Regions:
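Extended redox/cofactor-interaction regions of prokaryotic respiratory oxidoreductases
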Residues: 1, 165-249, 273-274, 336, ...
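N-terminal export/assembly segments and adjacent metallocofactor-ligating motifs
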Residues: 1-288, 459, 701, 746-783
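Glycine-rich phosphate/diphosphate-binding loops that line cofactor/substrate pockets in enzymes
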Residues: 131-150, 207-216, 326, 347-359, ...
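Acidic/polar loop patches that form or flank catalytic/metal-binding clefts of enzymes
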Residues: 181, 289-292, 345, 359-360, ...
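Glycine/threonine-rich phosphate-binding loop and adjacent beta-strand/alpha-helix elements that clamp
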Residues: 208, 511-535, 545-552
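Long, well-ordered, tryptophan-enriched scaffold segments
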Residues: 254-355
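Active-site phosphate/pyrophosphate-binding segments
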Residues: 311-433
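Long, contiguous, secondary-structure-rich segments that constitute the structural scaffold
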Residues: 542-591, 678-679, 683-693, 698-783
């Protein structure tokens, strides 16, 4: 049962050699094309599965299982690709999964904290002791503070599956009085909140098969080559082969730029709206805008199309011409702000406006700035001016979710008796001093909170500390045991967040449990994630031990409905079948053979009906039109929420006075070797992309920094020390590191792991009350 050690270099060499050979097996049998489960030897079976990490790919991982052990991982052979399915070839994360499953440092037993919270000192206890402790703490804390003192944190490591511990603990809490809910997605919550102010809905995306004849694609802060965002990269590569031109707007020369782009346009972070404003200025002053489209479908373009009750000079044309502030939004104006040459801005605007159709597709990185809502809406205004909304081959920009997406049903959730909701960004405040959580910072459905957070569940999540913006602010509250009285965490490893648990329990990997994987983006398919091997040591699924807790609280029959984990997956699948009779989903027994289901849908163009027949299909906005100017935003009277979504200098942006002290903008990217922080511990993947600070040669030279030097990245919130990567792939004035590295503080509190959240800000965005991880100013020096 032991797994022989193998280096990554040996792994790659072996893989390269095998790639040249036909797909053969020991017995001489060739695996049937497309077969999902096959017996290759009497001892070994090959099973199609997927991970349920916070990753949108849901790739075709082939687990080779022999005598209860995963011996290796492959992917679907190219000669067996299903023409009806997206290309599901497993990426480096999926191919390295076995090293994650069999890592010697995985948690093995339930443990109780014995040192100070955060020290990481624990002692082993039994499962009966663990579930009794949880049940007793729930009873005591609920009786003392009420159900609103109970909170469930983000469970990102299993968010790619339909069934997870964070969902089931919510079910348990709802059956026993409720809990304090949170809203907002830290991935895309800002754009999801902003896009409806233009279109009336966040679902502004089309299916990717409508783009195959698109002549120009602008990827704005989007990096699908590395992130594997729902397999869109395969569509883009096919489009490029067919002659589509790609322009990438990004401060960093990403792998997407190197593999797709005909042109790279770098800009200073947080200045996106200035670039967009200048593009719109060029488009309207050169009469490149789609006048008929604007006249028929929009509100707020000029003074003649403004809503009632708004004074003069608030329209888009008035803003661009400088009628109110005396500043015309010319490319020369934008060049000083963005550092994009004026002529490049002019050409980008002309290319976008005159190429029909064209698609401006935003990634979610730019909207994770404290100006992110404005950036998201700004892209929708550009799409509107050029008439690229509701047409095949165009793209409405903004959030980009697809309205025809279909999802599996989840476990049924009883009503929550606690009505108050907080933004996920408010949890530290709610734990520290609940009176500070008001409507101004995101409290919903209540005038005030009834209690501080006193008991917290963090199941399969590293957001408690590592992924939380302004990590030190969060850990100060976590370390104060008079605040949160009991923290339950489950994980595969002793992550930086797990160290703050009072009770820490070992979780199985996705190969040791049942689930259904769902894709992101527009790759609408479901894939079965079967329990392939038994968990070792005393690892148990969250649901399994939650049943014990439910029994000790007297609600087990209502909680489990008599189902084990596999029965829940079968139930969820059957509920999904019933909810989609037109899909003809197979029954569960058949699914266990076919392994996957691709949703049947014709090419889908967002807002096609609204454009084709606006009388019978008005936009779901107050005016029934595309709202270039939003009266709803105007009535908020907030300087950071302009009704037109134009450029406003960001807090900690390049124009902030703080830039004199901390002159470099730090951004992070999602890399190829992990999903957020998940798989950080995988030794193969650590080698695949080392944690370094990208710094431009000009900035490095000023600071006496050479390639490979350890550098100190610091601001008022924290200090981080990692090696420098001196490269022209990042523009001057900006530095970058990969997101998701584990926090590793030394005795002085200096992070040696490259965790950007020791430097990031917990400032919430003005409209969505969301996260702005990406907006931070730093200085860099040789350590």
């Amino acid at each position: 049962g032991t797994i022989p050690a193998i280096s990554r270099r040996q792994f790659i060499q072996a893989g390269s050699a095998l790639a040249a050979l036909p797909f053969v097996v020991k017995t001489g049998k060739v695996q049937a094309q497309g077969a999902a489960v096959s017996d290759t030897t009497p001892e070994e079976k090959v099973v199609q599965t997927c991970s349920t990490f916070d990753c949108g790919g849901k790739c075709d991982i082939r687990a080779h299982v022999s005598e209860g052990v995963v011996t290796r991982i492959s992917t679907r052979p190219d000669n067996a690709l299903d023409p009806q399915m997206p290309v599901m070839r497993a990426c480096v994360r999926g191919r390295a999964y076995r090293k994650f499953v069999y890592h010697p440092d995985r948690l093995k037993y339930p443990m109780k904290r014995v040192g100070k919270r955060g020290e990481g000192k624990f002692e082993r206890i039994t499962w009966d002791e663990a579930t009794t402790l949880i049940a007793n703490q729930l009873k005591t804390i609920t009786q003392k503070y009420g159900a609103a003192s109970r909170y469930v944190h983000v469970g990102t490591a299993v968010s790619g599956g339909t069934f997870s511990g964070d969902k089931m603990v919510r079910r348990l809490l709802n059956l026993t009085g409720g809990y304090l809910e949170s809203y907002h997605s830290v991935s895309m919550g800002n754009t999801a909140a902003a896009t409806p102010y233009t279109y009336g809905t966040a679902a502004s995306g089309s299916s990717l098969d409508t783009l195959l004849d698109t002549k120009l694609v602008i990827l704005w802060g989007h990096n699908p080559t590395e992130t594997i965002f729902g397999h869109s990269n395969h569509f883009y590569q096919k489009m490029k082969q067919n002659g589509t031109r790609f322009i990438v707007v990004d401060p960093r020369y990403s792998d997407t730029v190197s593999s797709l782009a005909d042109q790279w346009i770098p800009l200073l972070p947080t200045t996106d709206n200035a670039l967009m404003d200048a593009m719109m200025y060029v488009i309207v002053t050169e009469n490149l805008h789609d006048r008929d489209f604007i006249q028929r479908y929009t509100l707020g373009f000029d003074e003649d199309t403004m809503p009632e009750g708004v004074p003069a000079n608030e329209s888009l044309m008035a803003y661009l011409s400088g009628a109110k502030d005396g500043v015309a939004k010319t490319p020369e104006w934008a060049e000083k702000i963005t550092h994009v040459p004026a002529q490049t801005i002019r050409q980008l605007a002309r290319d976008y406006a005159t190429t029909k159709p064209a698609a401006l597709i935003q990634g979610w990185g730019p909207q994770r700035h404290n100006c992110g809502e404005r950036t998201a809406r700004g892209s929708t205004l550009l799409a509107t001016l050029t008439g690229n909304v509701g047409v095949k081959g165009g793209w409405a920009a903004g959030y980009g979710g697809c309205a025809n997406r279909k999802f599996a049903a989840g476990p049924e959730m009883p009503d929550n008796p606690v009505k108050a909701k907080i933004s996920v960004m408010n949890w530290v405040q709610a734990a520290d001093d609940a009176s500070q959580v008001t409507a101004d910072v995101g409290l919903k459905d209540a005038e005030k909170l009834d209690s501080n957070i006193r008991i917290l569940f963090s199941l399969a999540g590293n957001y408690l500390a590592n992924q939380n913006p302004d990590l030190h602010q969060a850990t100060r509250v976590l370390e104060d045991e008079s605040k949160i009285e009991f923290i339950v965490a489950s994980d595969l490893f002793m992550t930086p967040s797990a160290r703050y648990a009072d009770l820490l329990v070992p979780e199985p990997s996705s190969m040791e449990r049942w689930n259904i994987g769902e894709t992101w983006g527009t790759a609408s398919y479901l894939i079965l994630s079967e329990k392939l091997i038994e968990p070792e040591f005393e690892r148990r699924s969250d649901y399994d031990w939650l049943r014990e807790v439910a029994a000790k609280l007297g609600v087990e029959p209502a909680f489990s409905e008599g189902r084990d984990e596999k029965a829940w997956i079968e139930h969820i699948w059957e509920q999904t079948r019933l909810s989609m009779p037109d899909e003809n989903l197979p029954d569960f027994a058949t699914l266990q053979k076919t392994r996957q289901h691709l949703f049947k849908s014709a090419p889908f163009v967002a807002f096609e009906d609204n454009i084709r027949d606006p009388q019978n299909h008005p936009f779901p906005t107050p005016s029934g039109k595309i709202e270039i100017f939003s009266k709803r935003l105007y009535d908020m009277h907030h300087p950071e929420i302009p009704a037109l979504s134009h450029y406003v200098p960001a807090h900690e942006g390049p124009e902030d006075a703080l830039a004199k002290r901390f002159p470099l903008q730090l951004i992070t990217w999602k890399g190829k070797n992990r999903a957020n922080s998940t798989q950080y511990a995988n030794p193969w993947l650590i080698e695949a992309q080392q944690q370094k600070l990208w710094i431009n040669p000009q900035d490095a030279q000023k600071r006496g920094i050479a390639q490979g030097d350890t550098v100190r990245i610091h601001n008022a919130r924290g200090i981080c020390e990692i090696p420098a990567e001196v490269t022209p792939r990042i523009i001057p004035g900006v530095v970058a590191m990969q997101a998701g590295a584990w926090w590793q503080p030394d005795e002085q509190g200096i992070d040696k792991g490259g965790c950007a959240n020791v430097l990031s800000s917990a400032r919430i965005t003005a409209l969505a009350k969301g996260n702005s991880h990406q907006t931070m100013l730093v200085e860099v020096a040789k350590a």
